């Protein structure tokens, strides 16, 4: 990755000038894999655009705000200074974003209608809600969505693989 950060994948089956293709950043990876596999990423309008809206909403909003909440709730207290403004600001924004999810999920089962890369991208940012000091039951539709995705066999398998290093609820 030019950013020297994870995630990145390398596809040896797809090469550019004899060099395996590398794809970095979560959203780009999910789009690439969705297109390659022909799953969870519609190929036609308007469904594709709906998935892209929610994928970019996660990449630009939910993920960064959850990361900030996690930092100020779990790590900043280990450093001197008053971090209460920052913690409150990011907790409020994370709650606002959960409210956005809750409203849209009152109308449909998944963010873009059918289960998609938008849900795959968003799910990890909800899994640590207890660490963020959030009562997920306040957002009943998000809770239903979360429980539904968490019960999917492939998701269960992934959680099991990472159970020793992840903080899933």
Model-derived features with residue positions:
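GST-like domain detector, emphasizing the conserved glutathione-binding G-site
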Residues: 1-88, 92, 102
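Alpha-helix/helix-capping structural signal
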Residues: 28, 153-154
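GST-like fold's C-terminal all-alpha helical module
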Residues: 58-153
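Charged phosphate-binding loop/patch that engages nucleotide di/tri-phosphates or the phosphate backbone
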Residues: 158
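Exported/periplasmic ABC-transporter solute-binding proteins
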Residues: 161-162
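Conserved small/polar residues in nucleotide/adenosyl-binding loops
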Residues: 168-169
